[in-house]
């Protein structure tokens, strides 16, 4: 079974991603990982950190000469600002002189005014911390860089095993008019990444930028909605047999686990709930090579399984909780009214969030693909996929042949 985990703190020495269960023979390089990490840094409205943050990628294990080995894959993303934070984030106790110097450092000042909407408050109480630093270091969205690194391996596997492409775009930011056109195709990805807000429509882009400019002027932050599309998936990934095996639930759990994501929908999602049944589902018709559909309201999933249509997943991101116009809070050191701590932050990170949602969708799809088709090498997995696809085609073919004979 494909598994992944990340480790590291926002200002620590490095982030680490560990991927276990990937087959041998998948071609992926550190350059590809770095390219995906660069996409995560894209977006109008990002903060000052993006100007100097660099993701120094080192593959520690599991890949040799650009090909996976079948063992655990470990990827390190170094923190180029580590020298500034080494004393604050040191793993071992400091010597008395260094500890005394750190005592007077602004970087080490206790953070006792939790930010509404962040993990600070509950984390401090749950783990018994007097300072929010241990909470925010791990809760920070900086951790998603490690997920993107892991997801790069999953994307490479999906492309090489199934020909699947996973891409995303921003649907709306703040109160901007949402994009309501057809989903993008792989050939559109370069243009989307070239957009400062990763929009798939020029008018939508202008509306989103205007929202960001207004929020920046007001000292505020913005959320938004992103959509991920996966193209080329076969019928039958996932299962109807139990709740945890339904692909819907797996995707929703993975995407909701991203920092600041507060809602997930598959296909037309909540809009479907407002329709009558006759207008909510995707009717099927006989085609030359099997079943065809005129709509994709279900977003490629029915009964917890892929149905051969493009997968569409949307995620809603809340506004960033580190608000320049600081919100009211309580100083947990004194119990007094206070304003929340404020560190440098983005006005809007929705374009970057779209890339992270891509990552989590790719990881889940790679996992269910390996659960379905197995194999120790990419070649073996491909053989299993090809045999399954022939079987599916054969099940549809008799009906198609019968229609041809009748015609």
UniProtKB/Swiss-Prot annotation:
It catalyses: 5-O-(1-carboxyvinyl)-3-phosphoshikimate = chorismate + phosphate. Keywords: Amino-acid biosynthesis, Aromatic amino acid biosynthesis, FAD, Flavoprotein, FMN, Lyase, NADP. Residues 275-284 have a biased composition (Basic and acidic residues). Its cofactor is FMNH2. One of its GO terms (molecular function) is FMN binding. The keyword Oxidoreductase does not apply. SUPFAM superfamilies: Chorismate synthase, AroC. NADP(+) binds at residues 40, 46. One of its GO terms (cellular component) is cytosol. Residues 275-308 are annotated as: Disordered. FMN binds at residues 138-140, 259-260, 303, 318-322, 344. Reduced FMN (FMNH(2)). Pathway: Metabolic intermediate biosynthesis; chorismate biosynthesis; chorismate from D-erythrose 4-phosphate and phosphoenolpyruvate: step 7/7. Pfam families: Chorismate_synt (PF01264). This reaction introduces a second double bond into the aromatic ring system. Homotetramer. Belongs to the chorismate synthase family. This is Chorismate synthase. It comes from Mycobacterium ulcerans (strain Agy99). The lineage of its organism: Bacteria, Bacillati, Actinomycetota, Actinomycetes, Mycobacteriales.
